[in-house]
């Protein structure tokens, strides 16, 4: 097997009159950790925020009635972004159980209250969270 590689190098020199644009930092960057993490309403630290996210999900999750006969239980792993305005967005299921259960997890996460946004370098920043959710039929 022969592989041909062709490398093309473009001229990077500029003329004196040429205007060079410098790209600004990406404003839509999503962080995992920032200097000041988002805060759940009424919280002053990250531990309180984590507890309240899980409490909100637990209290507001409604097991889909049509699945009760099947007794589907287990862990759903979801990820979402607390955006610069403090809203939960970009909810995705990384590991699901059933479409109806996964849809309910997405609904509940989207219903999270507005957070105090996270900050990086004193500017609002979007922060991604990943949460394991244990679904049990009760």
Feature roles, as predicted:
Residues 1-138:
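Charge-biased low-complexity segments
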């Amino acid at each position: 097997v022969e592989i041909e590689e062709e490398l093309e190098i473009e001229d990077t020199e500029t003329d004196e009159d040429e205007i060079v644009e410098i790209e600004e930092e990406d404003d839509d960057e999503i962080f995992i950790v920032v200097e000041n993490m988002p805060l759940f309403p009424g919280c002053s630290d990250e531990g309180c925020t984590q507890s309240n996210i899980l409490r909100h999900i637990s209290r507001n999750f409604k097991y889909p009635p049509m699945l009760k006969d099947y007794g589907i239980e287990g862990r759903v792993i979801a990820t979402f972004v607390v955006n610069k305005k403090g809203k939960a967005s970009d909810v995705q299921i990384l590991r699901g159980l059933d479409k109806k259960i996964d849809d309910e997890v997405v609904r509940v996460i989207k219903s999270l209250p507005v957070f105090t946004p996270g900050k990086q370098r004193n500017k609002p920043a979007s922060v991604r969270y990943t949460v394991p959710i244990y679904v049990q039929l009760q």
